[in-house]
Amino acid sequence: MISSEEKAKIKEEIVDKVNSCLEKNGESFRMDKVTVLNREETVKFMGSYRVYDRRKYGAVSREINSFLKKYGDVEIKSKKIRDSGMKFTTVSFNFEL
């Protein structure tokens, strides 16, 4: 099982990296937190972010996905959203350690 300090470090690392990538690409959305689900044998980390400029989605997702893969097998899902005239792509991810 991963210690509380390690969990906190991983959560902070992910939020910092995702927000840095979004800011670098001129995106207004910022990730607040990563959720942790403690299981009997493993710990599951889950989060999501948005990309508003669909032309930048490829570059943003490639950079973030390559960073997340350092934690192992990552499940990543994306969905295009149109809400009250706003268009964006929401990306959710999760992995277990």
Regions found by a protein language model. Give the residues of each.
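Short amphipathic alpha-helical segments
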Residues: E6, I10, I14, Y52-I64
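Short, non-transmembrane amphipathic alpha-helical segments
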Residues: G58-I76
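Short amphipathic beta-strand and strand-loop transition segments with alternating hydrophobic
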Residues: M31-V36, E75-R82
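C-terminal edge-of-domain segments
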Residues: S78-L97
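N-proximal, solvent-exposed amphipathic alpha-helical segments enriched in charged/polar residues
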Residues: M1-D32
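Short glycine-rich, basic-tinged beta-strand/loop micro-motifs
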Residues: E27-R55
